[in-house]
Curated annotation (Swiss-Prot):
Name recorded for this polypeptide: Pyrrolysine--tRNA ligase
Biased composition (Low complexity): 133-188
Gene behind this protein: pylS
Organism domain of life: Archaea
Localization (cell): Cytoplasm
Keyword Zinc-finger carried by entry: no
Family listed: Belongs to the class-II aminoacyl-tRNA synthetase family.
Amino acid sequence: MDKKPLNTLISATGLWMSRTGKLHKIRHHEVSKRKIYIEMECGERLVVNNSRSCRAARALRHHKYRKICKHCRVSDEDLNKFLTRTNEDKSNAKVTVVSAPKIRKVMPKSVARTPKPLENTAPVQTLPSESQPAPTTPISASTTAPASTSTTAPAPASTTAPAPASTTAPASASTTISTSAMPASTSAQGTTKFNYISGGFPRPIPVQASAPALTKSQIDRLQGLLSPKDEISLDSGTPFRKLESELLSRRRKDLKQIYAEEREHYLGKLEREITKFFVDRGFLEIKSPILIPMEYIERMGIDNDKELSKQIFRVDNNFCLRPMLAPNLYNYLRKLNRALPDPIKIFEIGPCYRKESDGKEHLEEFTMLNFCQMGSGCTRENLEAIIKDFLDYLGIDFEIVGDSCMVYGDTLDVMHGDLELSSAVVGPVPMDRDWGINKPWIGAGFGLERLLKVMHNFKNIKRASRSESYYNGISTNL
């Protein structure tokens, strides 16, 4: 019978026993993956491990205590419930009936005795096929039977008669049997081949087996080593070790070439290219904090959406890791509006964090580009023109489709096939007044890892991310 974990015992009794045997009434408790947070009626708080075999679990399971806490007000009903030993429901017990093994009768040695082979007599070999040849006619030392005159009579499959001593030629140095007269035979199933050795007995010829099918872990390993430029099929029947060795050799060569020539990380190189593009077009580069107040998240309206709220990496009750760049850019637009001429154009490239589902298109740590313009010229036509110039600069095909989201309302999605590259907005939007913005604006956000995935034809977005497992899409697990 399995022992109940500590959280089950606490939920069943509502009581806690201290190390000194004092019984407490539990006011509230919360269970995490490994810990239990307990608050007593007397105000005492503690954190314990959720275990089956800890001291507290054993004490609650044995229903014994020394005294009751005076401030916890343990009722008689709770006490009686704790003292009553409730066994597990026996109706749920599974009973497995195991039959005793049958005892085989051992044949007496007098019945199971095998005849002793005669001296100077070759043992009889039975072929594995159902039709087996009769004993071969003995050949003397002075004569050799030609292959054309030898005859073979099939023997019954159920009986095998031992060769009599009178029909077996004695073994001597002058006795020879021609092996060329014995053709290779095949078993009834046609899978095992035999060749005949001296004495007319079959010897199996090994048949080379095909390479076994690749397991899922082997396929995952090979796919991690594959590069988009590799033309290697995993269904070719090539053994795993041979495929792995070939791919490892190629990846080491690729890393050596990068180290000798380029020495630039794809993500860092793309950041520098994007920075040059926007700086040359009059945009001001921004670097804002990664740790932001939870108040910014509430102002963006994320706390009202349950799914988006679950994606926030909270540091404590007051701060979190930024899930987007927009809050800080809002603040910069409001402050720079007091000093800079119209229009104000800014952009930022930096890491963001969300508890995204693990997949080929999502990362929990990713790099965002946000650009925005506030004031004159903030039209949809100008926004689409900036997006077109930017993606043409990177050499990426795209199309723009209409969409909507909870934060901004109506948006423009920039798509590359089925992959969303960006979400763009033409302001103003209702939340602008919460940030002190009262002018029209346009803006868009791009995920740099998705841009790299398209540019280098990566099948998995992790190859383009901040990772210790990949460098420029090349596996480092070599």
